[in-house]
Amino acid sequence: MSNPLEFPWLSVLVLLPLLAAFGIPLIPQSRWVRWYALAVGAFDLGLMAYVFARHYDLQDFSLQLAERYAWVPQIGFHWSLAVDGLSLPLVLLSGLITTLSIVAAWNLSHKPRLFFFLLLLMYGAQVGVFLAQDMLLFFLMWEIELVPVYLLISIWGGPKRQYAATKFILYTAAASIFILVGSLAMAFYGEGFSLEMAELSAKSYPLALELLAYAALLIAFGVKLPIFPLHTWLPDAHSEASAPISMILAGVLLKMGGYGLIRMNVGMLSEAHVYFAPVLAVLGVVNIIYGALAAFGQNHLKRRLAYSSIAHMGFVLIGISAFTELGINGAVLQMISHGLIAAVLFFLTGITYERTHTLALDKLGGLAKQMPKAFALFTAGSLASLALPGMSGFVGELTVFLGLTTSDAYAPTFKAGIALLAAVGIILTPIYLLSMLRQVFYGAQDPGLVLEDYLGDVRPREMAVALCLLLPILGIGFYPRLATQTYDVTTVAVAAQLRSVLATEIVQRPFFPSPVQSAQVAALPLED
């Protein structure tokens, strides 16, 4: 073990929920299971906060609290964990949203043992994905996470849950193959076989191999993010999943795709990123505009929010492609912000369904009078999603825009085109979100709508969950350093690495021009 503190903090964070899940069958009464799951989730979240507050140096961009144990040495497989500024905020986000999803599922009566067992398994696997430093361990955690999600949708989902769950597992399992392909392509190249991310990153690959590995990983992470046209599993999964699972799907699972792109495609395959970055920028714009336009056509509340998530993830792609500190910083901030915003909106959607038993927008209406607290919370979440100043959504999107427009890696016309098209998507966002609010809460109530009066407005438990998500949204909006201080040192290092590689590529590989290289070459002084 390389951790100088001589205590495996990160292993505890990963293994605690995984092992605790197997204690659920031993609980004598079903009503105690939710308390047990909540205790495990809250303790793990509290332990994260303690470990990172006491033992993590925010000014150090390198990997910290590293642990490395030989697991299957015959194939070079190690239990290797570490944390840096990129993984730290996403680990905390995973802990917060999963713990709150346990509270959101408090009244679950159908197979609670199995539900919370799967939820804790998924929790541990998510944390493992963000902390893994061995590609095979990363792949293992990635795969462990898929099975609980499939079962949570197929057992506790809506009428078309089997279709949605099958589509999810087919898309994501097929995409996982590309993680394995890309990892093995890098591991087998050169002298010695290694799956350690640090060693793979230190290798120098032929351009063709690096481009191939980058493309494979882009497909894998593009399904999870998701990137158009690999997105079609997401609206179906959200529309059929229960609210607590939708909170995790949008709040954490999509971020695994963005994390993988930055950690591996950008961090480990920087030379290939020079060639793919313009493609990511274009795909980001497609995500933004397509997601916004598709959201307009949805009559189902959760499907509209699902397409909204696709649009918001487009900003992550643009930030990753910018080659600037602000761009990478904005991409990470957008992931954190969207995780909080999407989680609260899907949670409030679940409350709406619990009261009305429908999510069809043409059957809803006039709920503001009966549910004023829900209306206020839903309005706050929607305003955050449309990037109202003073909320985290505004800071994330603004930082991405600044990162793109201040980049000198692209020709001015290319930057202007990307920025203009992304701005069109921003204009469309308030239209479909405010229209959604109007359809749900304003106007006359549908005569056929039966409101469960005995449930009333938002209850204290539900209010607590919503506020635990909205307060960080407001806090980051007014003081972005609450989030950015956890990772800005790391994003500076990533951007510096990209700039160095970009300059080298222009000199050494002028054949294979890209918009990035063309802009840089045009800016070079001409020789006499």
Swiss-Prot record:
The chain crosses the membrane at residues 7-27, 32-52, 86-106, 114-134, 136-156, 168-188, 208-228, 242-262, 276-296, 310-330, 331-351, 375-395, 417-437, 463-483. It is an enzyme of class 7 (translocase). GO terms for biological process: ATP synthesis coupled electron transport; electron transport coupled proton transport. It is found in: Cellular thylakoid membrane. It is a multi-pass membrane protein. One of its GO terms (cellular component) is plasma membrane-derived thylakoid membrane. One of its GO terms (molecular function) is NADH dehydrogenase (ubiquinone) activity. Keywords: Membrane, NAD, NADP, Plastoquinone, Quinone, Thylakoid, Translocase, Transmembrane, Transmembrane helix. It comes from the Bacteria. Its EC number is 7.1.1.-. It catalyses: a plastoquinone + NADH + (n+1) H(+)(in) = a plastoquinol + NAD(+) + n H(+)(out); a plastoquinone + NADPH + (n+1) H(+)(in) = a plastoquinol + NADP(+) + n H(+)(out). NCBIfam families: NDH_I_M (TIGR01972), PRK12561.1 (NF009212). NDH-1 shuttles electrons from NAD(P)H, via FMN and iron-sulfur (Fe-S) centers, to quinones in the respiratory chain. The immediate electron acceptor for the enzyme in this species is believed to be plastoquinone. Couples the redox reaction to proton translocation (for every two electrons transferred, four hydrogen ions are translocated across the cytoplasmic membrane), and thus conserves the redox energy in a proton gradient. Belongs to the complex I subunit 4 family. This is NAD(P)H-quinone oxidoreductase chain 4 1. The lineage of its organism: Bacteria, Bacillati, Cyanobacteriota, Cyanophyceae, Synechococcales. The gene is ndhD1.
